[in-house]
Amino acid sequence: MNSSCKSRVFNIISIIMVSMLILSLGAFANNNKAKADSHSKQLEINVKSDKVPQKVKDLAQQQFAGYAKALDKQSNAKTGKYELGEAFKIYKFNGEEDNSYYYPVIKDGKIVYTLTLSPKNKDDLNKSKEDMNYSVKISNFIAKDLDQIKDKNSNITVLTDEKGFYFEEDGKVRLVKATPLPGNVKEKESAKTVSAKLKQELKNTVTPTKVEENEAIQEDQVQYENTLKNFKIREQQFDNSWCAGFSMAALLNATKNTDTYNAHDIMRTLYPEVSEQDLPNCATFPNQMIEYGKSQGRDIHYQEGVPSYEQVDQLTKDNVGIMILAQSVSQNPNDPHLGHALAVVGNAKINDQEKLIYWNPWDTELSIQDADSSLLHLSFNRDYNWYGSMIGY
């Protein structure tokens, strides 16, 4: 090939390479712009401080994907690629904050769960945030509400009082989750306002950072799951005191593989003389729980404390239902939910750590938390101590 041909070929190759470089730079710029636009529209949640104890960060990043995958499996949802948003806090209207950290769990671009890190046992309630032992829990708590405004460039504060949970945005307060109380008002708009002190203390979080998990690691995180084969959520507690009725109905439906039990019918059986108007205020006592179970052909017995992981595993394999009995840590005598009952659905091993799966009648989905934690941080910002169990449903 003569020198003029070589020069012509070299020039053509150079032009092609420069063109490809320009195109790739353009694509990179467009991609970055798209990412920037996406981030600019993301939800921001106000917090007093974005400082989070390192042990909380580590636990959240280590555990969230396995927890999400395990909960997806329970609802027969397709697993996906899980990401973790930034931690946020929940405040009372006077500015007090609770003792937990909350993370949005994102799957395929949607907020699907909330990961909660809260004190592990009663003794931890008196420790500093840095010295506290934390329990990890996952549920759908306010996840759908957050997802609805995730891409609307919203800036909110998450608030709570005895009536439920609220989002405050641009001075307007909106109720998103109402506490299950008899006669509770369910209006979505609220005249409440954030205290001046809290407004002064709040600052905006940075754009939520998504921590991407390696796909191979996600596959290995859930080593084992064991649940009551026929457990289904058919109803939800709201404006009544029937937590034990809901729990017994769900467990008996599961272990008998039927759909004939419901909370209202159980409470009506226990209180045949009470009017329909007064029935929502009726609670259930341990002797009633035992007697009702026996009337349905079940040998129910009370066991103090939290059952061991091995016991839950075996009882679940044997198709035997366990009802959690819990007491509010606050011990407020005016609290209509001073005591609470929940249903154990099964157990799991995630990241080689033992977990329990349970249903809180206040919720529409299951929750998963550490098997060695006796403290239950439930949907309405309440800490309950798991003091005993009714076994045999």
Swiss-Prot record:
What species is given as this protein's source?
Answer: Staphylococcus aureus (strain NCTC 8325 / PS 47)
List the protein's name.
Answer: Staphopain B
Q: Where in the cell is it found?
A: Secreted
**Gene Ontology, cellular component aspect:** extracellular region
What GO biological process, any one, is recorded here? Answer: proteolysis
Q: Which InterPro entries does the UniProt entry name for this protein?
A: Cystatin_sf (IPR046350), Papain-like_cys_pep_sf (IPR038765), Pept_his_AS (IPR025660), Peptidase_C47 (IPR008750), Staphopain_pro (IPR028076), Staphopain_pro_sf (IPR037155)
Which range is the signal sequence, renumbered to this chain?
A: 1-36
Subunit comment for this entry?
In the cytoplasm, prematurely activated/folded SspB forms a stable non-covalent complex with SspC.
Domain of life, per UniProt, equals Bacteria
A single MF term (Gene Ontology): cysteine-type peptidase activity
Please provide the record's keywords in A-Z order. Hydrolase, Protease, Secreted, Signal, Thiol protease, Virulence, Zymogen
Q: Which SUPFAM superfamilies match?
A: Cystatin/monellin (SSF54403), Cysteine proteinases (SSF54001)
In which family does this protein belong, per the annotation? Answer: Belongs to the peptidase C47 family.
Additional record remark: The cascade of activation of extracellular proteases proceeds from the metalloprotease aureolysin (aur), through SspA to SspB.
As for what it does, the entry says: Cysteine protease that plays an important role in the inhibition of host innate immune response. Degrades host elastin, fibrogen, fibronectin and kininogen. Blocks phagocytosis of opsonised S.aureus by neutrophils and monocytes by inducing their death in a proteolytic activity-dependent manner. Decreases surface expression of the 'don't eat me' signal CD31 on neutrophils. Cleaves host galectin-3/LGALS3, thereby inhibiting the neutrophil-activating ability of the lectin.
